[in-house]
Design a protein with these regions (language model features):
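A Rossmann-like FAD-binding core segment of flavoenzymes
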Residues: 56-88, 96, 163-253, 258-260
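Short, small-residue-biased leader/transition segments that mark boundaries at the very start
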Residues: 1-8, 289-290
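Conserved N-terminal glycine-rich FAD pyrophosphate-binding loop of Rossmann-like flavoproteins
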Residues: 25-48, 183-184
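Rossmann-like NAD(P)H-binding beta-loop-alpha module
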Residues: 9-16, 132-178
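FAD-site-proximal beta/loop scaffold in flavoenzymes
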Residues: 103, 125-134, 237-286
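FAD-binding core/adjacent interface of flavoenzyme oxidoreductases
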Residues: 56-145, 222-229, 240, 267-270
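Residue-level detector of alpha-helix initiation sites
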Residues: 4-5, 27, 107-109, 152-154, ...
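Glycine-rich FAD pyrophosphate-binding loop
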Residues: 16-31, 174
Length: 290
């Protein structure tokens, strides 16, 4: 298993006793470890849990079944005949011949470079997930006056989180005429804290050379292009980008697995098997982008 897929317990209980998890992070659990807000586990466990609590339930189940795992282990390559090459500090280069491989590498966030926003490259521009990790796990505050671009759930949650940590979130701008986040998150993360949501708006300029000093947003038309004369300027030191996810599929492509050009993920059958027999793709490596 490449990555921290939470339901590995089900594979074990179905009769697969020889399982090895290869995780590049320092702990199991994946992105859940930095999601300290509640709302997890309602359907699975019948109670409301934080992300780390939710992950801990599955980690405990894996440990009870004595499922093997290697942390700080980076998978370098996967071949079509299911040969895995990985590396870590303790063992050096690791070669594994597997009978089956489950790919659960997740996603990475789309960066500022993919948006073509005019301006320099000053400090103070973060993806929402990076800011979440800095605040929730590393104990660092990215900034004090914030604009957030994108109204997906991570952007909404970080608007609330930054506010609770003492920052001033001036606005959440969304390119589309609707929010991509859950209605409850719009209410609990924006409305309850008086944070305005500007739909059909985007960032058109980032000011500042060493550090972000200002942001300009503008309304966009049906063609998603800025409308002249609708610009609004904000005096900020930080911008958080919540503008979509890109599947971590470098290993998938390297193995020669057939990819879906629309979702950027692997093409799979109903049992999640890819075009290579014995190689399965699960989790967020199937994320769909509009």
């Amino acid at each position: 298993l490449v990555g921290s897929e939470m339901c590995i317990r089900d594979r074990y209980d179905a009769g697969c006793r020889s399982i090895l998890i290869l995780e590049r992070d320092v702990q199991l659990g994946g992105i859940l470890n930095q999601c300290i807000h509640n709302g997890f586990g309602l359907h699975t466990f019948g109670e409301e849990l934080t992300g780390p609590e939710y992950a801990a339930r599955y980690i405990t189940q894996a440990l009870e079944r004595k499922i093997e795992y290697k942390l700080n282990t980076m998978v370098l390559s996967i071949s079509a005949d299911k040969h895995i090459t990985a590396v870590n500090r303790e063992e050096g280069l690791i070669e594994i011949d597997a009978r089956a491989i489950i790919l659960t590498m997740g996603c990475r966030e789309r960066s500022r470079g993919a948006l073509n926003i005019p301006g320099y490259r000053p400090a103070g521009i973060y993806s929402a997930g990076t800011a979440q990790r800095l605040v929730n796990m590393e104990g660092f505050m990215p900034g004090r006056r914030v604009v957030i671009l994108g109204s997906g759930d991570i952007g909404l949650i970080m608007a609330r989180r930054m506010t609770l940590e003492g920052a001033k979130v001036l606005v959440v701008a969304e390119l589309l005429p609707y929010s991509g986040g859950l209605k409850r998150n719009i209410v609990q993360c924006l409305n309850d804290f008086g944070i305005p949501l500007k739909l059909s708006h985007t960032v058109v300029n980032i000011e500042g050379k060493e550090r972000v000093s200002g942001i300009t947003i503008a309304e966009v038309g049906p063609d998603r292009k800025p409308i002249p004369g609708t610009e609004m300027e904000f005096d900020v030191d930080t911008i958080l980008l919540s503008v979509g996810l890109i599947p971590e599929n470098e290993l998938t492509k390297q193995a020669g697995i057939e990819m879906d050009p629309r979702t950027k993920g692997a093409i799979v059958y109903e049992n999640m098997e890819t075009s290579i027999p014995g190689v399965f793709a699960l989790s967020l490596i199937h994320i769909s982008e509009p």
